[in-house]
């Protein structure tokens, strides 16, 4: 066989649903790569003969290979920090109170408007490197800290540039509808007009976004405004998603499902009717335990109902300066289990196959299947559950991206 590389002495957590074993596991396995794709995988005993003198062979020392991790919800590009708000919350101020007093997202908006692209790129690069060291091979990055045309475009340009200069694939999401900017404080509908009539066309003209998102909440955009933005995005051929039911149950998830959204994110206050709507539309539920933990929330997402209705559950970092300044997907695995009572297998599925579904890229990544992109990680672990069980010592030993060894 003519391959570019072969990995032996490994166990595979393929996350392939067609394999009945937990994690889609194949023990005592091997995997071969050709032209950036997975060319063969299976039990080591069934590996076809190949020229060991001309093809690089990597020995996994009994470790586990998983698909590359996918962080499907981040706000990775921002300037400044909000440590002062952290102190205020510890003194009793709520997220909503801080936002209504001009803090929260708006304080980060000011810092981002003042920062240039070079500064934002370097900050984003450092954060992306941190995720990459934990086995992340694909990441979604949202805008939303500009809230004017110039700065929203600036953030999205930086995200695109990061994708060009880093081995991690970057998917971009336009989140101009993240908050009401100060200049539109008494005219939120006017700001929605700006998003639809000026921002969105400018984003499309430069091909800066793969999807459009809205923060549907009582401190941000109402249902009617949300539908206007998402409908405009959908009409333009972009994927849509939604921050929904984080602080209250406004019915945003049902709206997103009706419009065919790829995902609804946060969903702590999602009810059974909303879960049923997601199930019927195939929309993913993105769980964000970092924000739940950092904001010290008590209302948990309805995991049992999501299981009951077969809604794909995704885990993501929601890395951002205000509600989840936690740049770690491995910690999300642990939090997903300890805070939301996911099983370790559900948690890992949420950072691989289901995360790919939330981004619409499941045909190419998210599981180890012949023909898919060769994005995978070798972990120094004895069982896949160990990734969720233990935190603090990074067990990621090697990362292969598009068939190339990028971290060793």
UniProtKB/Swiss-Prot annotation:
Keywords: Cytoplasm, Histidine metabolism, Hydrolase, Iron, Metal-binding, Zinc
Family matches, as Pfam families: Amidohydro_1
Transmembrane regions listed in the UniProt entry: none
GO biological processes: L-histidine catabolic process to glutamate and formamide; L-histidine catabolic process to glutamate and formate
SUPFAM superfamilies membership: Composite domain of metallo-dependent hydrolases, Metallo-dependent hydrolases
PANTHER family from the UniProt entry: IMIDAZOLONEPROPIONASE, IMIDAZOLONEPROPIONASE-RELATED
Listed name of the protein: Imidazolonepropionase
Organism field: Shewanella baltica (strain OS155 / ATCC BAA-1091)
Gene: hutI
